[in-house]
Design a protein with these regions (language model features):
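Terminal alpha-helical segments
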Residues: 1-126
């Protein structure tokens, strides 16, 4: 559980960074930080099942299989994790900034919800 707690702390730090980047109008970087915050929370949840993966797709897929399909978390959480991943790909790898202010705000709000939901669940697992 210590590793899961460390991942949650890192996720919270990344979410704060995403908020600062959004205020600075660095939308691509804000989305990237938000996605990674969500990713770390998904990893923390998977650790409770002694699962660890080396790829983003592996974490996202396993999170869906073990937490969304089983009804532990609502389907919307899985959709938002996938959406954040897709937007992060655009923001990190496209040559021009294609992430809008509105999209970055939406991803940030989804990230907050994702992190709060997973963190609340993790607290109950102790």
């Amino acid at each position: 559980m210590r590793e899961a707690k460390a991942l949650i702390k890192k996720a919270q730090r990344y979410l704060k960074s995403a908020e600062i980047l959004l205020r600075d109008e660095d939308f691509d970087s804000s989305v990237s930080r938000t996605y990674y915050a969500m990713f770390y929370c998904a990893e923390a949840a998977l650790l409770t099942k002694n699962l660890s993966f080396s790829s983003h797709k592996g974490v996202i897929s396993a999170f869906g299989e073990h937490f969304i399909k089983t009804g532990i978390f609502p389907k919307e959480l899985g959709r938002e994790l996938n959406r954040a991943f897709e937007k992060r790909q655009i923001g990190d790898y496209e040559y021009t900034s294609l992430i809008s202010n509105e999209e970055a705000k939406e991803i940030l709000n989804s990230g907050r919800q994702f992190i709060n939901t997973v963190e609340d669940w993790l607290i109950k697992q102790v």
